[in-house]
Every structure is written in structure tokens, then in C-alpha cells.
Amino acid sequence: MRRWLVASMAPQLHQLLQPVRRCHHPLRIPSVQLAAPRSHTHEDIAYASCPACSRVVHMCDMLTHLITAHRELDQTHCRKMCTERLALYERVIGVPLKKSELTSSGRRVLDFLPTVLPTGYMCNWCDRRSDVYATRDKFLKHVADVHTDIDLEEVEPHVPLPPRGVVVEKSNGDGGPQPTRRLNGVVAVAEKSEPINAVPRILGISLPRGVDRPLKATAQFSDTEFPCELCNRTFNSEIDLLQHLETRHPDGTAEGPAGVDSAAIADVAQFSAKEATTGGDQRVHVICDLCVSSSKVYKMPSALFSHIRFKHPNEDAAFHVERLIREQKTVSSFVCTVCQKAFASAAALDGHFNSKHAEQGEAQNVVGRVTANNCWWCHDCEKGFSSAKGLHGHMQNKHGLSSQTHPCPACKRVFADIYSLEEHLSLQHKTIRLSDIGLLTHVKCSTCERFFLSHEDLHRHAVKHHKKDPRAPAQPFEAPTSASHVAASTSAAVPSEVEATASPQGPRKVKKRKKTTEVSEVTS
């Protein structure tokens, strides 16, 4: 009975096992896909999670990671996914993605160690992984010769040793390696490899900003914009302009309009390098008087040198930079208290403040009404405090004011600041005052009724907001005359009784006055 059932079911079992026998090739999974980026930004497009292990990998290294760590995936499908994502990055950002970027782990070298095969080592740092090195020493020699940017001493301890029991036999026979089994009707075809013609990459800024937009040659620039004289791009600050000149036009070989003098570019680069080494922190407020109608204020000598070198090529740029800085050193400038931009006139500053910082007008109005909550003023950040101790702590935390201990002259107790000492004296030693020991707690501005911690802060405040002469001393000298001198000078014309009623607080020199009257009677 059993034999009859097996014989009857044999054709059905043969049909079921036939598809399985045909699947002699290894399993490939082409259905994996990269997750769509959350937004079209550099961070979200340049990095992606591996669809197999969820590891965040840089897109320039994603293909290498997929075909080395997940060999069960289809290489053609993986290459197509990576190519589409790189094309999306170039279409959105505007430039190809650089391969010099590191992976998320920051150790790109150790993330792609060589693959150990039965026949040797395969280098994963090469773009084309077709060569296999038979020994570990040959692989390390390849790394030292080809990949010079990789530290060999750092990589060598992590390169694994060849597995035990693997012996590479060298045969001197005429025939090469032959397959052990062939199917009927199958003809062996030699493998052909076509070289890949890689498109040369265009090196540039990986993250172009909105302010770096190209403009027409006839465009008109406002006083708050800083254009590049070579490619007509505009920037919002001089620092951005200088960085653009150093990166895009360093030696005259970068892209630029026809007719640009390469010597001028070299002079600008040399002047900027000299300024960075000798006086890179110098800040000035200079207007170019060579231009007929120009009200742009230059705050860096290198930016002024670049303007004169390109706009006025027949002039000596270095001489005029030194001359303008020397002549306009004492000229008062108009600087915005919010964004620190300089302007040539008060009207230009008011227009900028009303258009750019209208909402912060009340908060930044220095000459406004003084209240008890903001009478203690910080000149650096234009902010008021309700107490001197709060202003002192702000100056220490934000502006690096040096801390100094103050001992009590009576009980020798040490305090961290002068205001704690003043509070201690008012409670424990009421007969001692800070003025008796020569300590100053604050100074007051006579114009706006604000308090400052030192005469230097008051001087800078008065120069900036009350048109004080910057050459004037920060601390005024004491008057040579006093109340006693005034009273003595007016004693001859005013009787003693009237003088006593007019100035009861003045000192009375009765003995000296009597002596002078007696001497006058004797002489008469």
C-alpha cells in the first residue's frame, strides 16, 4: 500500500522540487531602498542609514559599505541607489558631494579595513577593488605607496592576519585553473572589464548660501553690501568677502571675468596674509575718498586694500590704506549697537536702524528714560541692571572682568567683591566708609544719570553717546579752588555778619582777620 502511494506521488514531488534545483546562483536581495531624506539640506542628503543594518554612513562611502559588509545584496541595485542619491545632492545643493568628508564615526580609515579572502587581501580604500594582494606585507606596501594620506602606523595594528590553514599553492603546469564540473552546452567566456571614465569633479563650496548669489555686472550695491570685484557676488560682511577671496580667488587661477589682473589678486592675498600675521585684529572705520560718491565704511585694512587695488588700479593701494587710516583715525564713526555695522553718517545709521532693527528700538535706545531697574549700565552690550552687584557679576561672567579680593580693615575678613565689603561695613563697622580707605564703587554720568563701575567705562560711554572728546582724560582732575579759597577772597568786600549768614558752612578765620586789621592800623 505504501509503495503504491509513493509511486503515485512521485511526479508531483518532482514538479515541486524543480524550481528549487534551478536556483543554483546565490541569493540576491534587490528590494532594499534608502530612506527618503527628511529635508533637502546637506546633513540630510549627504548622510543616510544603511537599509540593512541601520548604520548612518556618508553617501560617498555607502556603496563600499553595502558591497563589503552586506555581500548578499545585489551590487547593481546598490550602485543605482547610491548614484541616485548623489545626483539628488548635486541637483539640490549645486555641487557634487566631496569624498573627503569623514563618516559619522569620524574614523573613516578604520571603518573600511581590508577584506581577508582565501587568496589574500582586498583593499577597500581603492575605488576599484579588483586587485588581491597575496600576503599581508604586500598589502601594507600598497597602502604606503598608493594611499599616502593614511597613517600606516595607525592602520597596521588593525589589519588582521591571514586565516590559518590557507595555503596558496603555486603550480608550474601549462594549464590554468579549470572548473571541476561543467554543464552540458555551456561555453566558457573570458571576462571583460571595461575601464570606467570618471567625470572630473568640480571643487567648490559645498554649502552655497543665499547671500552668495551671482549678480549682473551692472548691478547697484547698497552701503550694507560688500561685492566681490572678480565675480560680482555680494556678501553681508567683510569677513565673508575676505573668506571668499581667499578660497575662490587665491592666486588668480580661479574662475573670474575676463581681463582680471592676476597680479592684483596676488597682491591682495599677500596683504591679507601680512595683516593676519602682524595685525590681524586691527579694526578701523575708513571711507575711501578716491571714489566720487561712496559712503561705504571699511572696518578692515585688507578689505580697503582690495577695493583700491581693483577699483583704482593706477593708485598705490598700500600708500592710500596707510594714509586713510592715519587721516580718519580721529573721525567719529556711527556704529549700529545691534549688528556692529559702521556707517558714514548719522542719517544712514538711523535709516538702517529703523529698517533692520525697528522691533529692538526701545531695547537699544541708550539715551532713553532711566529707571531703577536699569540705572547700572554695561557699556559693552548696552544692557541695564538694577544693582551694582548684578552689573559686577555680569562683567565677570560675560566680559572677563578680573576678580579681586577686598579685606576688611577692621576685622581682616576677606570679601570676594567690593560691594560685599561695603555691605559688611554698613552693618558691622558703621564708622568706616569706603572713601576713607580709598576705594571707589561706582561713577555717575551727569548727562543720562547712569552708573558705571569705573571711569574708563564712563569715558567710553560718553565718547560714544554724548560726543565727548576721546582725547580727554577718562578721570577728571580735581579743581584747584575750594570753598575756603572762595570764602577768603570775598571776605574783604562782605562784612563778617553778612558773610556768616550767607555761607554758614564756610570756615571762619577770625584770628587771621584780626591780625590783618591790626597791622593795617599800625601802618596807617
Curated annotation (Swiss-Prot):
User: GO molecular-function annotation terms?
Assistant: DNA-binding transcription factor activity, RNA polymerase II-specific; sequence-specific DNA binding; zinc ion binding
Keyword line? Metal-binding, Mitochondrion, mRNA processing, Repeat, Transit peptide, Zinc, Zinc-finger
What does the entry list under GO cellular component? mitochondrial mRNA editing complex; mitochondrion; nucleus
Which domain of life, per UniProt?
Answer: Eukaryota
Q: What happens when the gene is disrupted?
A: RNAi-mediated knockdown at the procyclic stage causes a reduction in mitochondrial mRNA editing. Formation of the REH2C complex is not affected but REH2C complex association with the GRBC, REMC, RECC complexes and with and pre-mRNA is impaired. Integrity of the GRBC complex is not affected but GRBC complex association with the RECC complex and pre-mRNA is reduced. Causes a slight decrease in REH2 protein levels. Does not affect the RNA unwinding activity of the REH2C complex.
Q: Which SMART domains match?
A: ZnF_C2H2
Q: Which Pfam families match?
A: zf-C2H2_6, zf-C2H2_jaz, zf-met
Gene Ontology annotations of biological process type:
mitochondrial RNA processing; mRNA processing; post-transcriptional regulation of gene expression; regulation of transcription by RNA polymerase II; RNA processing
Tell me where it mainly resides.
Answer: mitochondrion
| Compositional bias of kind Low complexity | 479-500
**Entries under PROSITE patterns matching the protein:** ZINC_FINGER_C2H2_1, ZINC_FINGER_C2H2_2
Record localization: Mitochondrion
Return the annotated region ranges for Disordered. Answer: 463-524
| Interval spanned by the transit peptide | 1-22
Zinc finger C2H2-type: from-to: 48-70, 121-147, 226-249, 286-312, 334-357, 376-399, 406-429, 443-465
Q: What is known about what this protein does?
A: Plays an important role in mitochondrial mRNA editing by promoting the assembly of the mRNA editosome. Facilitates the recruitment of mRNA to the REH2C complex and promotes the interaction between various editing complexes including REH2C, GRBC, REMC and RECC complexes.
Checking PANTHER family in the record gives: FI01116P-RELATED, ZINC FINGER PROTEIN
Under the subunit heading, UniProt states: Component of the REH2-associated complex (REH2C) composed of helicase REH2, associated factors H2F1 and H2F2, and mRNAs at various editing stages; the formation of the complex is RNA-independent. Within the complex, interacts with REH2; the interaction is direct. Interacts with various editing complexes including the RNA editing core (RECC) complex, the gRNA-binding (GRBC) complex (also known as the MRB1 complex) and the RNA editing mediator (REMC) complex.
Protein known as:
REH2-associated factor 1
Q: Which gene produces this protein?
A: H2F1
